[in-house]
Amino acid sequence: MLAALIYTILAILLSVLATSYICIIYGVKRRVLQPVKTKNSTEINHNAYQKYTQAPGPRPWPIIGNLHLLDRYRDSPFAGFTALAQQYGDIYSLTFGHTRCLVVNNLELIREVLNQNGKVMSGRPDFIRYHKLFGGERSNSLALCDWSQLQQKRRNLARRHCSPREFSCFYMKMSQIGCEEMEHWNRELGNQLVPGEPINIKPLILKACANMFSQYMCSLRFDYDDVDFQQIVQYFDEIFWEINQGHPLDFLPWLYPFYQRHLNKIINWSSTIRGFIMERIIRHRELSVDLDEPDRDFTDALLKSLLEDKDVSRNTIIFMLEDFIGGHSAVGNLVMLVLAYIAKNVDIGRRIQEEIDAIIEEENRSINLLDMNAMPYTMATIFEVLRYSSSPIVPHVATEDTVISGYGVTKGTIVFINNYVLNTSEKFWVNPKEFNPLRFLEPSKEQSPKNSKGSDSGIESDNEKLQLKRNIPHFLPFSIGKRTCIGQNLVRGFGFLVVVNVMQRYNISSHNPSTIKISPESLALPADCFPLVLTPREKIGPL
């Protein structure tokens, strides 16, 4: 009896393995049929088709596909993709679980995917975690949904407020809010700071960034001691870390029971955030919306669209605010990384402070966004952090069968954009493993940049006559194409304001810089990261 049971179990297991392997191999061998373009024309002949084989790649195993190949690259999967490119070329296929994947590893291929084929490569992975984060439906998220007319409408609605142009009224509003919030931040830090003692300033940095976003988008500011506010700032940071991690569950959904506790935690984070947005922001604001008055902020625009557009629901508003207010976590983590590299290299901090001191001179004011163009080294440092951390671009998904670089790509294929290879290749950068902001600077062809008062920056140091390089084609921190990051100007602007206003007042150091551990390939830092020593500057201008 026992022997029969064992044989039955073995037979079932072998059957599962065989079925899995057959399905995987079918996915690997399947060819893509595409209509042939008529000779010397861009017109398509729908009566003639050509078969395209898929890009080469390693043979997958049953059940797990090629996931085992990344096992030794757990902390740096895109470094694993780069290593595999040495064997299989700049474009190759992988199978994760039963899901076909394509990895593109050079600039020309990335542009072909994101620009030339942006329409058919506009989907997002259908990961269970993505659904759990957004109320059971990832289409609620602007960043994680597939492309659609509703998605385009939401982007258009957000663009005016969330992509402020330089010197526009929204740009000036962002500058004022950022500077005022850093005054609150400085007072709060003064209550916590013990001279010479390290402090974990990440929670305080995140609160300041969260208030900048909530004031800019909702015209509401929250006290740092507000318990509910503290909680949602923490949960936003946890979610930012979560989205930047990979889990076997993403490709092996049968592992779901083992992730139930973790997924419940994710659901709790996101539902708590949405409850806060509903009770503390939307209910507070919807009673005062006036269709005849100009929009005060993004929340006004959303509430008006709720009244005027039948395709916009209350849930649409809640999820859009969750998406965009959550952008503060990216800013906070970026700032922490900048401060970490300053603590590791005091010369970087010194040069940033030289730019600051040259601009404010004897003026009684904080640095603002109008000073950004006169502070090329500071911006170069922020860009070098973005390059060095090489945060992954959210994967794309083929929404129909297509062809990339002569290879067939089947519908549903997940496409990984390997910007890590762009950021670390000696083809594009001199000594790419070295952290060096100067790589983003070049000799200025113009006079010294003007500050917000119209005077020369007057920097008498190595920063003299340097300007920020523009349009570096292989530097894509915010992606390109249809799904480029719509909030990148907010990230740059608020990130700049926090960094310079911290450096204007404090010297940043660490008792032991070697203990500052930074994960590769990620902008996200764990909630409990590294402490820093903030020493008030002896000379900070009249402030």
Curated annotation (Swiss-Prot):
It is found in: Endoplasmic reticulum membrane; Microsome membrane. GO terms for biological process: central nervous system development; cuticle development; dorsal closure; ecdysone biosynthetic process; embryonic development via the syncytial blastoderm; embryonic digestive tract development; head involution; midgut development. The keyword Hydrolase does not apply. Residues 449-460 have a biased composition (Polar residues). Its main location: endoplasmic reticulum. GO terms for cellular component: endoplasmic reticulum; endoplasmic reticulum membrane. Keywords: Developmental protein, Endoplasmic reticulum, Heme, Iron, Membrane, Metal-binding, Microsome, Monooxygenase, Oxidoreductase, Phosphoprotein. Its EC number is 1.14.-.-. It is a peripheral membrane protein. Heme binds at C485. Its cofactor is heme. Pfam families: p450. One of its GO terms (molecular function) is oxidoreductase activity. The modification Phosphoserine is found at S219. Residues 440-460 are annotated as: Disordered. The keyword Lipid metabolism does not apply. Required for correct development of the embryonic midline glial cells which are necessary for the formation of distinct segmental commissures. Member of the Halloween gene group. Belongs to the cytochrome P450 family. This is Cytochrome P450 307a1. It comes from Drosophila melanogaster. The lineage of its organism: Eukaryota, Metazoa, Ecdysozoa, Arthropoda, Hexapoda.
